Amino acid sequence: MQTKETTNEGLKRAYKLTLTAKEIDAKIDAEVKKVAPQVRMPGFRPGKVPANLVRKMHGEQMHAQVINDSIRDSVDALIKEKELRPAMQPKIDLNEDYEQGKDAVVSVSLEILPKVEAPSIDDLKLERLTVPVSDEQVMETIERIAGQNKSYKDAAKTRKAADGDQLIIDFTGSVDGVEFEGGKAEDAPLVLGSGTFIPGFEEQLKGVKTGDEKTITVTFPKDYQAENLAGKEAQFDVKVKQVKVETDTTIDDEFAANLGLENLDKLKELIRGQLEQETNGLTRTAMKRSLLDQLAAGHDFPVPEGMVDAEFEQIWNQLQQEAAQEEDPDKALKEIEAEKDDYRAIAERRVRLGLLLSEIGQANGVEISQQEMSMLTMQAAQQYREEDRERFMQFIQQDPMAAAQLRAPLYEDKVVDFLFDKAEVTDREVTREELEAAIEAEAEEEKKPAAKKKAPAKKAEPKKAAAKKAPAKKAPAKKAAAKDGDEKPAAKKAPAKKAPAKKASTKKPAEKKAPAKKPAAKKAPAKKPAAKK
């Protein structure tokens, strides 16, 4: 193999590799000798088919395989010989006029990782803003839960049902006098004014009393989930078995038991733990941003454009998805377009910090164990259809690049935790509002034109309580796609395992493609589609 360097500018490298026709032909001959003993052909004893016939039968296929393997091996040898550290998958091209019997000229272009010296971590100083959880906060949360879990008691038989009252009803629905599937229910609870049943249903039950029977007529929405009912007029025979009125909920052991807890103390313990988890997430976000800011301030080395492009694309795609869900998508899209350069700066910052964290981790022996990687892979596999999970796990095992991308966020967290342990940390007690304001203030500081804009942190999402805890106030934050809390160390890309024989590229073979993620589940039809929206 002949090697010629054609580009050496900054982090960009390019080479021309020449595989002589003689080399290629010799490898094809070796492949023929290897497979000849297994070839069967009428008129010849097993294993005795002449090499020239084997080559005639399978030569084209062997040639393609030899070219693929030769390109792969040549690129691997180049990277090893030149001691290159590819930032991303090298771009590999085979000359378009190549044909069997001629030299193969392969163009290889790539960006390399910059040389980054791991900084000293001896003088790191961090402030940890802590938020204590008071008994009052715990009870406020429980009271919100109680407000969301309303209780009802039987009303007097003379009471006429009004908005906010709960009805216990039996109903039977029909279209043109014929009952339809799902149009019948017994002891169905319905809170008037809740809007849970199709338009017109609840309104016609206002004023009914316990024991009343009534036939109501409604029209199903044109976009109703059951196509056989969409847009059709239906009649419902309704029997009101009980009118109930809302009553105050007593917060006691019985209330906790209704929520699946042993007693009220256990409920308080659960809520306190969740509130602490929320605030601990915010504390970590603020502390991590302070750490990253310190690291970013002292380092401004060049980063590979390809890595920045890939990071920016990820940020941009998420921002566009979020904008599309806003009340005014066009306005939201214009807003992010106006800040496009800022988001690219965020992407560059992420890549730079990622490379820096990676070097710090390697210099200090931070590693991800095989057990941790296995658990990470199994967790990631859960987002795929059950039949695709095994294939996804095999894909991760076989593709170093995919494994590196999956490993990166966990590795970052381990490096950050390592730095937290090494830093001199002082605690300061603040309110939740002060902590959120501190995070937002850092974001506002980054908006100044003189500074590169970075991503503000996003509040950690609390786990949902079994008791349907009311959501806490959201921390003032910018788009999730650009939060510093998601800084990811750059995954070091592996060279392509195989290069296609024609116009080689970095695309993976089809069998190694990651399985498609399972689609979002379609909303299941309600058990009683006749009466529900």
Swiss-Prot record:
<keyword id="KW-0132">Cell division</keyword>
<dbReference type="InterPro" id="IPR037041">
    <property type="entry name" value="Trigger_fac_C_sf"/>
</dbReference>
<keyword id="KW-0143">Chaperone</keyword>
<feature type="region of interest" description="Disordered">
    <location>
        <begin position="436"/>
        <end position="533"/>
    </location>
</feature>
<dbReference type="Pfam" id="PF00254">
    <property type="entry name" value="FKBP_C"/>
</dbReference>
<dbReference type="InterPro" id="IPR008881">
    <property type="entry name" value="Trigger_fac_ribosome-bd_bac"/>
</dbReference>
<dbReference type="GO" id="GO:0015031">
    <property type="term" value="P:protein transport"/>
</dbReference>
<dbReference type="InterPro" id="IPR046357">
    <property type="entry name" value="PPIase_dom_sf"/>
</dbReference>
<comment type="function">
    <text>Involved in protein export. Acts as a chaperone by maintaining the newly synthesized protein in an open conformation. Functions as a peptidyl-prolyl cis-trans isomerase.</text>
</comment>
<dbReference type="GO" id="GO:0044183">
    <property type="term" value="F:protein folding chaperone"/>
</dbReference>
<feature type="domain" description="PPIase FKBP-type">
    <location>
        <begin position="164"/>
        <end position="249"/>
    </location>
</feature>
<dbReference type="Pfam" id="PF05698">
    <property type="entry name" value="Trigger_C"/>
</dbReference>
<dbReference type="GO" id="GO:0043022">
    <property type="term" value="F:ribosome binding"/>
</dbReference>
<dbReference type="GO" id="GO:0043335">
    <property type="term" value="P:protein unfolding"/>
</dbReference>
<feature type="compositionally biased region" description="Basic and acidic residues">
    <location>
        <begin position="481"/>
        <end position="490"/>
    </location>
</feature>
<dbReference type="GO" id="GO:0051301">
    <property type="term" value="P:cell division"/>
</dbReference>
<feature type="compositionally biased region" description="Basic residues">
    <location>
        <begin position="465"/>
        <end position="477"/>
    </location>
</feature>
<dbReference type="GO" id="GO:0005737">
    <property type="term" value="C:cytoplasm"/>
</dbReference>
<feature type="compositionally biased region" description="Basic residues">
    <location>
        <begin position="494"/>
        <end position="506"/>
    </location>
</feature>
<dbReference type="GO" id="GO:0003755">
    <property type="term" value="F:peptidyl-prolyl cis-trans isomerase activity"/>
</dbReference>
<dbReference type="InterPro" id="IPR008880">
    <property type="entry name" value="Trigger_fac_C"/>
</dbReference>
<comment type="similarity">
    <text>Belongs to the FKBP-type PPIase family. Tig subfamily.</text>
</comment>
<keyword id="KW-0131">Cell cycle</keyword>
<keyword id="KW-0963">Cytoplasm</keyword>
<keyword id="KW-0413">Isomerase</keyword>
<feature type="compositionally biased region" description="Basic residues">
    <location>
        <begin position="515"/>
        <end position="533"/>
    </location>
</feature>
<dbReference type="GO" id="GO:0051083">
    <property type="term" value="P:'de novo' cotranslational protein folding"/>
</dbReference>
<dbReference type="Pfam" id="PF05697">
    <property type="entry name" value="Trigger_N"/>
</dbReference>
<dbReference type="InterPro" id="IPR036611">
    <property type="entry name" value="Trigger_fac_ribosome-bd_sf"/>
</dbReference>
<keyword id="KW-0697">Rotamase</keyword>
<dbReference type="GO" id="GO:0061077">
    <property type="term" value="P:chaperone-mediated protein folding"/>
</dbReference>
<protein>
    <recommendedName>
        <fullName>Trigger factor</fullName>
        <ecNumber>5.2.1.8</ecNumber>
    </recommendedName>
</protein>
<dbReference type="InterPro" id="IPR001179">
    <property type="entry name" value="PPIase_FKBP_dom"/>
</dbReference>
<dbReference type="InterPro" id="IPR005215">
    <property type="entry name" value="Trig_fac"/>
</dbReference>
<dbReference type="InterPro" id="IPR027304">
    <property type="entry name" value="Trigger_fact/SurA_dom_sf"/>
</dbReference>
